[in-house]
Amino acid sequence: MKTVTEYQNKNVLVLGIAKSGYAAATLLKKLGANVIVNDGKPLAGNVLAAELQAEGMDVVCGGHPLELLERNISLVVKNPGIPYSNPLLVAAKEKQIPIVTEVELAYSISAAPFVGITGSNGKTTTTMLTFEMLKEGQKHPVIAGNIGTVACEVAQLAKENEVVVTELSSFQLMGVESFQPKIAAFLNLFEAHLDYHGTKKEYGLAKANIFKNQTETDYSIINADDADVMALSAYSKGQKVLFSTTKEIEDGAYIKDNALYFKGEKVVKVSDIVLPGKHNLENILAAMSIAKLLGVSNEAITAVLKSFTGVKHRLEYVTTINNRKFYNDSKATNMLATEKALSAFTQPIVLLAGGLDRGNEFDDLIPYFKHVKAIVTFGQTAPKLVRAAEKAGLDVIESVDTLDDAVVKAYAHSTDGDVILLSPACASWDQFKTFEERGDIFIQAVHKLI
């Protein structure tokens, strides 16, 4: 950890606890800050808040009183999930108090450089691929953020010869002040999180903050096939390295003659890649670009791609029952992810979809229903998905109350050789705590069929 003095004797407000808030508060206290912790949940039953209070921190729970800002606050470190429309944050902004997230704090103390990966879809897979390629290439990666350990905890232990690889959401990137990843990858942009950002434009600008502080000594990995990402890459002053699955990129990564190339050099044959789905070729090209820029050999990259079968809840193969293959794609929390999942198969598909209603319709899915023989919907968005399926002319359309019921119905509508796919196209929070919980319940329901 770098020697950092900027927080000493400063009054810092940590807004929202959870894992990242707890880690941020603990680190700030270690760095000599006067830490005030605020959480919307009541103190009763709030285990993390009670622990911080026991460590001598000032903990205020049960709401977000504006009076907290009267304590000469120098900095607000906020939980990524708390929107900037929160009255306390609005007031802090009016007072010109800097507002950051835990990742910014982690970067400020890290002795190791950062690789940051963002995009609407594919972040986790690309992050894991990058980590595995760097590990195979003996580049000493450590993984942080939404997967792995909280960034603050990783940064405290990271050494100069290591690389911090982190997946970054738009919520985290909105709080960028000085965060400067050595390599920043922007995978794609799709209309998502409009309940948080308001418009796709604002969502894209938040993502583009990953480039905000890059200089000509840094690298920006850009999806050349995504017009929105290409436009937002104008915010980068780093060296741009493009990747494409549709055309050759002279100074970037591309596919040619059934092989993946980087800057004109053949790296790996497509036939050596075991991870399914055309969309995953985009993720692989991005991860490969990062690995090559950091000096990983073609042999190490190939070794990873010959064995990497994917990330849990991302088009995860579950089992085969009576020649029906079940796949868990619970991480598909928006339409683009489901479009890519549907495009990964040529067999007839029985689709399970539905979840939290964020205000969007599902007509964009209609062109991807060509292999879908039946759909079973659940959750808040079930009626909207039914309307889209009717427009697509599907013959078999069902709505049920629970995911368990959806699995039973999906199996009943399947025949020999079908794929039964959970790819919800929606967030999970209407019925589940997380997409991971949703995926686990799907897997349990599938095994009950055996």
UniProtKB/Swiss-Prot annotation:
Bridged cysteine pairs (disulfide): none
Keyword Nucleotidyltransferase: no
Keyword annotations of the record: ATP-binding, Cell cycle, Cell division, Cell shape, Cell wall biogenesis/degradation, Cytoplasm, Ligase, Nucleotide-binding, Peptidoglycan synthesis
Compartments, as annotated in UniProt: Cytoplasm
Stored InterPro entries: Mur-like_cat_sf, Mur_ligase_C, Mur_ligase_C_dom_sf, Mur_ligase_cen, MurD
Gene Ontology cellular component list: cytoplasm
Pathways involved: Cell wall biogenesis; peptidoglycan biosynthesis
Binding-site positions, ATP: G119, S120, N121, G122, K123, T124, T125
Keyword S-adenosyl-L-methionine tagged: no
Family under the similarity heading: Belongs to the MurCDEF family.
HAMAP family documented for this protein: MurD
The protein's role, per its UniProt record: Cell wall formation. Catalyzes the addition of glutamate to the nucleotide precursor UDP-N-acetylmuramoyl-L-alanine (UMA).
Name of this protein: UDP-N-acetylmuramoylalanine--D-glutamate ligase
Organism encoding this protein: Bacillus mycoides (strain KBAB4) (Bacillus weihenstephanensis)
